[in-house]
């Protein structure tokens, strides 16, 4: 029980943490090298459902790898809404059609992939919710949960994966060169999803030289 002297002098505050959970595509593999497929999957995931079911409501969707409300984040960017209609339209544009057994197919091949994650209950639950939502629009998803050392050495380092559910913690330093620069894709480096964008490379390099915080 609270001490009488403190009972009326305390207040509880909620503050968003510096970590986030993400779905990471292997951009060097089909069909994840197709932007429309990635966008469709984003639309098909009910992020509010994940936040309520996994985080007990203590979280919010984000639209970039920067914490909302910080000087590094862009308030004009909005998270993808949950819309199966938009997801299916994008997949249709990408060449997929619904088969008789209600799965998406392109050139005779079903749209299916494996999500891998480490032994973390929140990430396992997140993967299951994603799997259910993607099944609703005709995407086959399997889940594999792997011990961390095997996860890194057998799958991440050699790039032998389709999709991962992982988490990342942000530091006070906004520099994310090691995560997103195209030069950081080697074994043991952090850009293991294979993100490669020349404009982003230039901005990351410029950011490392910039001393003006407002820029």
Tell me the role of every PLM-derived stretch:
Residues 1, 97-170, 213:
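Ligand/substrate-recognition segments at binding pockets and active sites
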Residues 2-13, 158-160, 174-189:
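Ligand-binding "clamshell"
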Residues 4, 27-29, 44-49, 54-58, ...:
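Sec/Tat-exported extracytoplasmic proteins
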Residues 7, 17-20, 61, 110, ...:
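Extracytoplasmic
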Residues 12-13, 32-132, 196:
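Append "and occasionally in soluble cytosolic enzymes with long acidic Gly/Pro-rich linkers
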Residues 19-23, 64, 191:
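Small-molecule pocket liners
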Residues 36, 51-52, 72, 89, ...:
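Extracytoplasmic/peripheral linker and loop segments enriched in polar/acidic and small residues
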């Amino acid at each position: 029980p609270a001490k009488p002297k403190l009972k009326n002098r305390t207040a509880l505050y909620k503050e968003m943490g510096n970590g986030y959970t993400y779905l990471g595509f292997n951009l060097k593999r089909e069909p994840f090298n197709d932007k429309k497929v990635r966008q469709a999957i984003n639309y098909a995931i009910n992020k509010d459902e994940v936040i309520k079911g996994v985080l007990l409501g203590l979280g919010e969707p984000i639209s970039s790898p920067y914490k909302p409300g910080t000087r590094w984040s862009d308030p004009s960017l909005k998270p993808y809404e949950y819309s199966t209609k938009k997801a299916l339209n994008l997949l249709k544009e990408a060449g997929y059609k619904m088969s008789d057994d209600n799965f998406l197919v392109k050139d005779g091949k079903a749209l299916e992939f494996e999500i891998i994650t480490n032994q973390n209950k929140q990430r396992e639950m997140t993967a299951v919710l994603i799997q259910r939502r993607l099944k609703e629009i005709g995407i086959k998803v399997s889940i594999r949960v792997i011990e961390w050392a095997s996860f890194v050495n057998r799958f991440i380092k050699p790039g032998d994966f389709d999709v991962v559910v992982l988490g990342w913690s942000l530091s006070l330093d906004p520099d994310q060169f090691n995560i997103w620069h195209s030069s950081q894709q080697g074994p043991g480096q952090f850009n293991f999803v294979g993100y490669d964008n020349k404009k982003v490379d230039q901005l990351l390099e410029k950011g490392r030289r910039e001393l003006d915080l407002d820029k």
